[in-house]
Amino acid sequence: VLITTKMGQRGKTVITANLSAGMQQVAHQIPMLNTAGWVERQIAIRNYNHVYLNGERRPGRDESDPNSARALGNKIPNEYKDPSLLHDINWQDEVYRNVPMTNYQLSASGGTGSMRFYISGNYINQEALNIGKGYKKYSLRGNIDADITNKIKVGFRIAPSYSINNVGASAGLTYYGGLNVALVTLPPIYPAYNPDGTFATRADMPLTYDDGTSPSILNFTNPAAMSALYKSQMKRFNTLGTFFTTVELARNLVFKTSISADVNNVVTDHHVPSTINIAGANRYATSFFSTNIGWTNENTVTYENTFNDKHRLNVLAGFTEQKGQFQSLSVRVNDLPNDLVETVNAGTLASRTASKTEWTMASLIGRVNYVFDDKYYVTATLRRDGSSKFGSDSRWGTFPSAAIAWRVSQEGFMNSVQAISELKIRASYGLVGNDQIGRYAAIGAVAASNAILGTGDGQQLNGLM
């Protein structure tokens, strides 16, 4: 894999600006019943359930029976008999919208005789299809290369970014599941808004029976309110930085050392007001904070040479080390005093968790590439890795590999085959491994137990032993 980095050229500074903009919309909405069709279906279902049991008609029952003779679930509200008294909406239209997305980029590059630079800034604003949600990102990038002498070069890369992501409601906030499920399962008979512009709730959509009772509307959570009022915001600040130095030790022999850091800070806040929470008055909020820091140090020596215009040799040996540190804190509170207060200090503590971990890894690496006449390739690699995630008796692993290749398209007999421009046959064998286990999986955890201490009946002590 060849990774290239944008870099300025010697000469005058070049400034480049790019702007892209577009619109997003739902490609295809799911067709839904209108109120008249939905009510007709509901009446048919309730009449059937009232009259039939397991496919058999119940004696003495008829579709014309009044509500007073029906079970609660089979009663027919007065409003169903005249659908014009009900609302007629498509919940997808109430939540989905056509939204813009923009991307701004500005960069400058240039250099002098011994220094080159590239600096850029980027701003992305992408509103979500559902109301109240969207994504913004601000990022910078700086690349600098400098020649200290004709044998020593240094370079610096830095890429900070800050993003704000307001995401949609997750599953479990309604009887129908998440937001997108609710949009295609909630009946069209309920309003999204009251006449004064506020979001409609259960209390704003009374239904009545002709026997003087009213059904309890338990299974309603306004999707428009859920999309607009449910808050789940993630703020992420990330910085990638690398500093490297290359030194030409001798002809065709180069030493390179680099140190890189990846710092990632995340703050996530959730707030669920009573208007969209099934639990009603149980308003709740959560806050999550985390810091993830990764360090990498690489040191390599490379020898590269060509002999007699046909033999190419590349030999690399090196040592690398990595370290990762992670720390997090999560807090949830219930019973916030009202829907305007969103901070966790104002509620009743429901749960809290904290975590702090770290890991290290060290590697010895080696590679030999040999090419003859640009036709025949031989590669051999060897690496030995040690990870702190494993126990002391199995911490290190050795992973060799080898490959041979024949670039057939470079042979003379392929000159007449115009249909093939590049053909290479390659065979390889190697061993690979990973350390994707828990950071402390190799260490036995301390557990709680009971113990009897003393003479006679003794004394029972609870706790860690």
Name these PLM-found stretches.
Residues 94-98, 108-112:
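Outer-membrane beta-barrel initiation region
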Residues 106, 142, 241-243, 299-301, ...:
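Membrane-embedded beta-strands of outer-membrane beta-barrel proteins
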Residues 9-88, 128-133, 139, 143-238, ...:
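Surface-exposed loop/interface segments of Gram-negative outer-membrane beta-barrel transport/assembly proteins
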